[in-house]
From Swiss-Prot:
Enzyme Commission number(s): 4.3.2.10
Organism annotation: Wolinella succinogenes (strain ATCC 29543 / DSM 1740 / CCUG 13145 / JCM 31913 / LMG 7466 / NCTC 11488 / FDC 602W) (Vibrio succinogenes)
Gene for this chain: hisF
Thylakoid as UniProt keyword: no
Entry's Gene Ontology molecular function annotations: imidazoleglycerol-phosphate synthase activity; lyase activity
Catalytic activity: 5-[(5-phospho-1-deoxy-D-ribulos-1-ylimino)methylamino]-1-(5-phospho-beta-D-ribosyl)imidazole-4-carboxamide + L-glutamine = D-erythro-1-(imidazol-4-yl)glycerol 3-phosphate + 5-amino-1-(5-phospho-beta-D-ribosyl)imidazole-4-carboxamide + L-glutamate + H(+)
Key word Metal-binding present: no
Entry-linked CDD domains: HisF
Pathway per the UniProt entry: Amino-acid biosynthesis; L-histidine biosynthesis; L-histidine from 5-phospho-alpha-D-ribose 1-diphosphate: step 5/9
Name the UniProt record assigns to this protein: Imidazole glycerol phosphate synthase subunit HisF
Annotated Gene Ontology cellular component terms: cytoplasm
Subunit structure, as described in the record: Heterodimer of HisH and HisF.
Keywords: Amino-acid biosynthesis, Cytoplasm, Histidine biosynthesis, Lyase
GO BP of this protein: L-histidine biosynthetic process
HAMAP family referenced in this protein's UniProt entry, alphabetically: HisF
Length: 254
């Protein structure tokens, strides 16, 4: 794959082994089956798939590993899994089951050495650090939030981004909490700022509503665009999106 090609990544929330936020594909026998949904996205031209495990039980790991094994047998594009990864053993179990990358968020803030240890053990290319950021009230910048956006850490986004990079993260998945769910576009100022700060791939998340929004994210320095609703509800077809991006001079894999 062209390393300069921009990537389109549908994100699926998984709860107790099922896809939540219904996926509106015609002809799917079971829209809650992660394997079936992943297979369809693979056929439709997604470059990668991200799974976020939102199950709040300790049984989550076994269920998620079963899903990863089943998906990896059927789907040959990279698979990233996040949610509840707190230690190296969790990373090992998921990577061993067949996922390509693991995504850590709150656990990286609580134990930053997890980034170094994961990168050293499995390679930076396997470690994605997800960051949820929100504008400060005085608009002087952004703070990092954890626990699904419920807790303001008081940590500055730029400082944390630099630390994550220096500790060996291979990619950063940046969610703008201000833009998330608005369908009014990604936070392009945030993307521009971070893309100048570090030279690892930046995945934009939060705010996509149109093809133009995704183009703007790429022009603002994002290497990949992640979205859920617009793809799940077929508001945007991935191949149509890629043809549009290519017509606008943005390199994508068709």
């Amino acid at each position: 794959m062209n390393p300069l090609a921009k990537r389109i990544i549908p994100c699926l929330d998984i709860k107790e082994g099922r896809v939540v936020k219904g996926v509106n594909f015609l002809g799917l026998r079971d829209a809650g089956d992660p394997v079936e949904v992943a297979r369809r996205y693979n056929e439709e031209g997604a470059d990668e798939i991200a799974f976020l495990d939102i199950t709040a039980t300790h049984e989550r790991r076994d269920t998620m590993c079963d899903i990863v094994r089943a998906v990896a047998k059927e789907v040959f594009i990279p698979l990233t899994v996040g949610g509840g990864i707190r230690k190296l053993e969790d990373m090992y179990t998921l990577l061993n089951a067949g996922c390509d990358k693991v995504s850590i968020n709150s656990s990286a803030i609580k134990n930053p050495s997890l980034i170094d240890e994961g990168a050293k053990r499995f390679g930076s290319q396997c470690i994605v650090v997800a960051i949820d950021a929100k504008s400060r009230a005085d608009k002087s910048g952004w703070n990092v939030y954890i626990n699904g956006g419920r807790i303001d850490t008081g940590i500055d986004l730029l400082e944390w981004t630099k630390e994550v990079y220096e500790r060996g993260a291979g990619e950063i998945l940046l969610t703008s909490m201000d833009a998330d769910g608005t369908k009014a576009g990604y936070d392009c100022e945030q993307l521009q700022t971070l893309s100048k700060l570090v030279d690892i791939p930046l995945i934009a998340s939060g705010g996509a509503g149109t093809m133009e929004h995704i183009k703007e994210a790429f022009l603002s320095g994002a290497d990949a665009a992640l979205a859920a609703t617009i793809f799940h509800y077929k508001e945007i077809d991935i191949m149509d999106l890629k043809r549009y991006l290519r017509s606008e001079g943005i390199e994508v894999r068709l």
